[in-house]
Amino acid sequence: MNTFGHFLRVTTWGESHGRAVGCVIDGFPAGLEVDEEFIQREMERRRPGKKYTTQRKEVDRVEILSGVFEGLTTATPISMVVWNVDADSSAYESLKTVFRPGHADYTYWAKFGVRDWRGGGRASARETAARVAAGAMAKLLLRRYDVKVMGYAKEIAGVSCEVDDAEKAFERAERSPLRMPDERAEKEAEQRLKEAMSEGDSVGGVVEVVAKNVPAGLGEPVFGKLDAYLAYAVMGIPAVKGVEIGAGFEAARKRGSENNDPIVLKDGRIRFATNNAGGILGGISNGEDIVLRAAIKPTPSISKKQRTVDYEKMEEAEISVKGRHDPCIVPRAVPVVEAMVALVLADCMLMQGLIPRSLL
Amino acid sequence: MNTFGHFLRVTTWGESHGRAVGCVIDGFPAGLEVDEEFIQREMERRRPGKKYTTQRKEVDRVEILSGVFEGLTTATPISMVVWNVDADSSAYESLKTVFRPGHADYTYWAKFGVRDWRGGGRASARETAARVAAGAMAKLLLRRYDVKVMGYAKEIAGVSCEVDDAEKAFERAERSPLRMPDERAEKEAEQRLKEAMSEGDSVGGVVEVVAKNVPAGLGEPVFGKLDAYLAYAVMGIPAVKGVEIGAGFEAARKRGSENNDPIVLKDGRIRFATNNAGGILGGISNGEDIVLRAAIKPTPSISKKQRTVDYEKMEEAEISVKGRHDPCIVPRAVPVVEAMVALVLADCMLMQGLIPRSLL
Amino acid sequence: MNTFGHFLRVTTWGESHGRAVGCVIDGFPAGLEVDEEFIQREMERRRPGKKYTTQRKEVDRVEILSGVFEGLTTATPISMVVWNVDADSSAYESLKTVFRPGHADYTYWAKFGVRDWRGGGRASARETAARVAAGAMAKLLLRRYDVKVMGYAKEIAGVSCEVDDAEKAFERAERSPLRMPDERAEKEAEQRLKEAMSEGDSVGGVVEVVAKNVPAGLGEPVFGKLDAYLAYAVMGIPAVKGVEIGAGFEAARKRGSENNDPIVLKDGRIRFATNNAGGILGGISNGEDIVLRAAIKPTPSISKKQRTVDYEKMEEAEISVKGRHDPCIVPRAVPVVEAMVALVLADCMLMQGLIPRSLL
Amino acid sequence: MNTFGHFLRVTTWGESHGRAVGCVIDGFPAGLEVDEEFIQREMERRRPGKKYTTQRKEVDRVEILSGVFEGLTTATPISMVVWNVDADSSAYESLKTVFRPGHADYTYWAKFGVRDWRGGGRASARETAARVAAGAMAKLLLRRYDVKVMGYAKEIAGVSCEVDDAEKAFERAERSPLRMPDERAEKEAEQRLKEAMSEGDSVGGVVEVVAKNVPAGLGEPVFGKLDAYLAYAVMGIPAVKGVEIGAGFEAARKRGSENNDPIVLKDGRIRFATNNAGGILGGISNGEDIVLRAAIKPTPSISKKQRTVDYEKMEEAEISVKGRHDPCIVPRAVPVVEAMVALVLADCMLMQGLIPRSLL
């Protein structure tokens, strides 16, 4: 279950404080030129060590060990490694026998009877570095078909952004430390974030991802629907607690006549006048933008005191999680959600035969 | 992609106006006594022909064709059939060449170049009868392990119910035509629904499902997380546009200190003082109730006039969808969401070894 | 595990003496005209009730319950049912508590703790009726791409046929009660079969299947190789104990210089001068005929006395299996092996993009 | 399709002359002590650079990058890397545009339009180093349940060994340069091999693997039968052209009364008096030894002149494959077949619940 995808399959491996994290991409078509700089730029977007993020210093350089020959993919598995450089387990020594609230410490222990307590081990968000590397490959592939996947923080600490145009929002957000597309909202969110930080607390938010130029016909009813697949992909990202498509939960409050997107002809092609459906009808893409939002919970690692249990002594205890943590994971979650969406879309295009097995 | 599940796999088949719908359940353990009455009661909960639902008359009797011998499951595939009795395609004749807005008509046509236009064909919610039949088998299995899956309409037409206790809410909702647990909310929702109906319109809502006595340890990180699997299962139900777990989108507005569930000892066992996590941490169940909500869009079939395209003439057209439709699909969606949750939980318990291959 | 295939997936269900056997085909492309007569002819080739076969009378009429609309496939699941008409469990009553040697009686009991003792239940070769029905659909699809799958009994009771041309061999074999392409061998095999029958015994043989006009490029290294996939498909047929490709076990006795097929140009196309490889190199089809042989063990049901164990009394016992059994299953196994080969080839062509999702 | 297994899944990656080969093992239970020395000994058994093998010098040291913490497996993915040290592509430069007969050169090119021509790239038997590493982990797991997987060369160059006792045969073979258990046969085979070598030619043979103490109940009918799964696993090994179980192709020549294994009581337990079935009935293990044979073709790389095609000039050509090649791959294939058998058995034991998710 560390493998994602049907036709294009990504297997990730590695722990937060182990030697490395990495992935193997299988089913990638032959003949794509690998733009390593692009991959590195994607890694950079998720990388820690910036404002409002953990101060762990990781260069996150991706090494490709297989599957590429003379600059081209060969349709054989692409093995990518990101070495862990700045893992520091000392802060975790004292947490060895207590479960951090809001983390997977207890559940891993309950499931497997053993856990790597250093920095969350496998459950650490560090694993998502491998997803971003794989997602970068998917984006390179989609780029060739003019499909763009763009994300930003739609909301942080309860402050929501107005977004008219996803492309502009994306560009604006890329220059924002909170990855928010709306300056006014950003200011307010920043204020709330600082307040939380000053109290040793954290905040959450909502990531929105829009995919443009997605062809109609993607998705496999009745269980492998495009929206079901996206929900699976995105809900499996650490800290995500909700996923919605198009109008999402708001659709539940609308009338049918409001929510149904009128079908029209534009330039002789069948299109939709509105996009409450978020680009998906009956689990199949309809040619409009795919619009998806993910609810990101506040970072569970906080220095504020919390109640927990010490399982060696089997007694209640107090905990204050030190170490280097993101007070808000939302900005760094954006490229991860994008990566998963890109992987889903590339996989569906391959399944639908819209991307061939070989580009040559 | 008409198969759902890993260890416990359900394949559904059939079209709304074809001869039957049905399913094959594979991987079901040997030795379970099959309570056919229970299965039939579950079918009855989803069955059309009642107040505020389509008036199509279907007895929805399940026939078991294989996999059961002398009343016990044998671990071989269980084939179940529900014959279509009251399909009436006449209302659809006039819609043959126009796409119904909010339906899968356009996308099936775009994907496959052909579609069964009678009542939505495969994309019809009639397919969910097969899911409920399979889900009933999963519930029978879970019942043996004291796991209960209970759902109700949390919200209809924007009117939300107060719920303290899921078990009582479930019981109350079972006696409600809107399957709402809160009488006051029900009255108001009923009023809004009637208004919509009088205008040839429809409404949506939110289904909440709670699973009790779920053991800790279910779910397969990092991609096959329990919440990801549930999101996949539930987002794939027709009309669902959003899924959230525990505090869900509200979690995005909380502080870490509010959202983290304190870990405590109750009767010497590790438990959680609150349940914002909805019973899942790091993608693995933590022993608390699983709490999930699904946003259900308003029924797309409305008699109100809508804009669409006639694809034979390739020109814009108006459409008014006649036929027998649910003005609000939420009450009938409840057992479907429950069925998918039950299938996920049974599958995870099998994968985790908590349910053996043979109960004998 | 009652599902076969990756892209084109077949799920079979049903027991020998249950109500029916059937299958659900998922992933079948849209737009194929369904030739029901062809399907029925394929069923006829496997049907019991002929010379040298069990005298069980089954018309084996296939009913299609879904996935076909106005004569065309719609890319939705195709559900097919074959009702059991002439099941007679009385002969099995006395065998309820003894394991038949050479059968799956003991292993099903050991695995599941319960078994349907009537006619072998799920382990009966009757299940292969569903495979032949599904295989017929695959053949219809392949026919459109001029791919032909032809089988015959290469050997029965140790008597082997000379085969020069697979197409002629197939045609000759279709008129032979033993499905043997070589008259001289057939006479001798018939003699040996009659001898065995007169002693209440049975014989085995070898089925050879040749697939013509298979495009190069099918198969997925390194684990999903075409030969591995074929071996999986064919070894899973009841009574098969060995599978070989091309020169097979004989290749193990050759020199490299003899076994390597020289690569040549024929009419400007790259071809192979010989076909020891059986059309597969490195797990990928090379454009030559696929040649596969399966070893079929002698029918385990024999009236000759055998030693066994009565597991109720837990003591040794003697058994003489009465009932209506094939003294040699090889002729009826031929269409089953063909069906599995056809399913594999159709699946691989879909995966490789050589057959599109929609033929329209 | 570079992933093998259902519950225990192995993904291999890497090319012969790339930077490394490796694998990721997913689904491995928690709590197993990792005996790195054992893994290394297994690598040593497959390692090149010995008598009658290629003279490529590879230390084949396995590095474990994840999934192990404080010496114990953690149920998270185990990433293993074997760096390529002595790859020398110079001998392949001249073969860039010609297909080597008997190799996958043509088929990879036909399938993907591009190929890594250095040493066979992904199709090289070097990939099996990763399989042996993964297989070693499976063996460690099986060892805990007393299941032993032992292989040897049953036949080389047409010379067959007598084997009475698999355990003794295995031990004897481990000391033999040809990995043959029978000294007389070994001498003769060695003679024939030398003759072939002197003519720039190669020979093939048959590997036999026996698994002892395999519990009854493994295998998933009707498609995922244990024998089908083994056939899939073993036929997918480079150079394998045939697989048989128990009596295999010989069973096809026997009478039912000879081939059926009598069922008897030994020490109060149900057992089989003979083992023509090779430990598998109806696709499920019966508690007897699993016996499997694989036909290995002669090494296709020979210095003897062969006919081929130069695809740049698109004209016929002659080829003499220089470089460092095994004149007979059989001895080195033995641990690879064992590895695949071990992976299958461990996977089936996990699926059957005979190995738990955590050993703690």
UniProtKB/Swiss-Prot annotation, chains A, B, C, D:
List residues binding NADP(+).
R46
Q: How is the cofactor bound?
A: Reduced FMN (FMNH(2)).
Which HAMAP family does this chain map to? Chorismate_synth
> Pathway involvement?
Metabolic intermediate biosynthesis; chorismate biosynthesis; chorismate from D-erythrose 4-phosphate and phosphoenolpyruvate: step 7/7
Q: Sum up the protein's function in the record's words.
A: This reaction introduces a second double bond into the aromatic ring system.
- Keyword Cell cycle among UniProt keywords: no
Identify the EC number(s). 4.2.3.5
Name of the molecule in the record: Chorismate synthase
List the keywords (alphabetical): Amino-acid biosynthesis, Aromatic amino acid biosynthesis, FAD, Flavoprotein, FMN, Lyase, NADP
**GO cellular component assignments:** cytosol
Biological source species: Archaeoglobus fulgidus (strain ATCC 49558 / DSM 4304 / JCM 9628 / NBRC 100126 / VC-16)
Q: Name one GO biological process term.
A: amino acid biosynthetic process
Q: Which reaction does it catalyse?
A: 5-O-(1-carboxyvinyl)-3-phosphoshikimate = chorismate + phosphate
GO MF annotations, alphabetized: chorismate synthase activity; FMN binding
Q: State the similarity comment.
A: Belongs to the chorismate synthase family.
The UniProt record gives the binding positions of FMN as: R122, A123, S124, G282, K297, P298, T299, P300, S301, R324
List, separated by semicolons, the cofactors it needs: FMNH2
Superkingdom of the source species: Archaea
